[in-house]
Each structure stands twice: as C-alpha cells, then as structure tokens.
C-alpha cells in the first residue's frame, strides 16, 4: 500500500485528487492533504509518504521546493506534479 500526500492550495483540486487516489484502495491511501508546502513538511515525518502529489505554485513553499525537501527526507518517494500553467519551464525545473 502506497502512502500518498497531496499538497495544493486549491481546496477543490485537493478534494478531487483525493477522490481519484481513493478509487484505488488496494494500492493507495491518502495520509495527508495540505494547502501549502510548509504544512506538508511540518507533518511529513509522522506520515512517512511514498508518493507526493503537488501543485507547482503554492504559498510559502513551491511544489518544486517541496519535492527537493522530500527527496532528502524520503529518497525513495515518487512525485507527481499537477498544474494549470501552460509554461513548460516549470516541468523542466521539476525534472532537474
């Protein structure tokens, strides 16, 4: 069972992502939903996530910074980036 954290500053998006993940209860469980990267980091040590689903632009800490932080704390964690932006430079930055 993969443990998933969702970080997105839009509540509707967080809720929709959570619903999508929960369609696979044998494989995934959502262990935390956060409206910003700071809250995700503050709660991550007790949640021990395997997967991060994050927006790129959020208050306090960007999704890219959040991924970088989690890669140090949880090196095997996988990340999924969601964004409404059409600027592909965010994707290139996230892949670095």
Describe the function of each predicted region.
Residues 1-3:
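Non-catalytic signal-transmission and effector/linker regions of two-component phosphorelay proteins
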Residues 20-21, 35, 68-71:
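A short alpha-helix capping/helix-coil boundary motif
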Residues 27-35, 43, 91:
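Short hydrophobic/Thr-rich beta-strand motif most characteristic of the beta2 strand and flanking loop
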Residues 9-11, 56:
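Generic detector of well-ordered alpha-helical packing
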Residues 41-96:
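CheY-like receiver
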Residues 7-8, 34, 52:
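Conserved sequence signature across two-component system core domains
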Residues 11-32:
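Two-component/phosphorelay signaling modules centered on CheY-like receiver
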């Amino acid at each position: 069972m993969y443990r998933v954290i969702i970080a997105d500053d839009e509540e509707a998006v967080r809720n929709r992502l959570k619903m999508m993940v929960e369609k696979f209860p044998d494989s995934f469980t959502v262990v935390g939903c956060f409206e910003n990267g700071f809250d995700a980091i503050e709660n991550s040590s007790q949640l021990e996530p395997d997967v991060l689903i994050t927006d790129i632009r959020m208050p306090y800490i960007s999704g890219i910074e959040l991924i970088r932080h989690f890669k140090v704390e949880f090196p095997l964690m996988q990340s999924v980036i969601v964004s409404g932006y059409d600027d592909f430079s965010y994707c290139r930055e996230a892949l670095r």
